[in-house]
Curated annotation (Swiss-Prot):
Localization (cell): Cytoplasm, Nucleoid
Sequence segments annotated as region (Disordered): 77-96
SUPFAM superfamilies tied to this protein: H-NS histone-like proteins
GO molecular function, one term: minor groove of adenine-thymine-rich DNA binding
One GO CC term, this protein: protein-DNA complex
Protein name: DNA-binding protein H-NS, plasmid
Coiled coil segments of this chain: 23-67
Organism: Salmonella typhi
Keyword Metal-binding listed: no
Record-stated family: Belongs to the histone-like protein H-NS family.
Chain's role: A DNA-binding protein implicated in transcriptional repression and chromosome organization and compaction. Binds DNA, modifying gene expression, especially non-core genes. Does not regulate the same set of genes as its chromosomal counterpart (tested in S.typhimurium strain SL1344 / SV5015, chromosomal H-NS protein is AC A0A0H3NBY9). Thus it has a not-completely overlapping set of gene targets compared to its chromosomal homolog; many of these target genes are either plasmid-encoded or acquired by horizontally transferred genes (HTG).
Alphabetized InterPro entries for the sequence: H-NS-like_N, H-NS_C_dom, H-NS_C_dom_sf, Histone_HNS, Histone_HNS_N
DNA-binding region (UniProt annotation): 112-117
Gene: hns
Amino acid sequence: MSEALKSLNNIRTLRAQGRELPLEILEELLEKLSVVVEERRQEESSKEAELKARLEKIESLRQLMLEDGIDPEELLSSFSAKSGAPKKVREPRPAKYKYTDVNGETKTWTGQGRTPKALAEQLEAGKKLDDFLI
């Protein structure tokens, strides 16, 4: 909450500020705040009415489905069965290149993704990628 709102929410601060302001300005502030509160109440009631209308529509559709012999749970399960299919996991590719890194360890690379740093350095030194084929 901002400092201005904190001070508006504190009764002692409001009383102290109210003593310093003329009555006309205080009444004007009261009118404006009342308008804001009323607008907010109307927004909340309209949202509540929309939600109520939506729930009534859902219930009427559910009743129509039951009258036609369609179980809503059955309908939902048919959708979830299709979308919940497990994703196929791709098998790892076999290594295509073999190289020795800076520490002297022999490593492999499939040829996909970024070229390993040790292999890239050797390629820059003049070796060919075909030299590292397994």
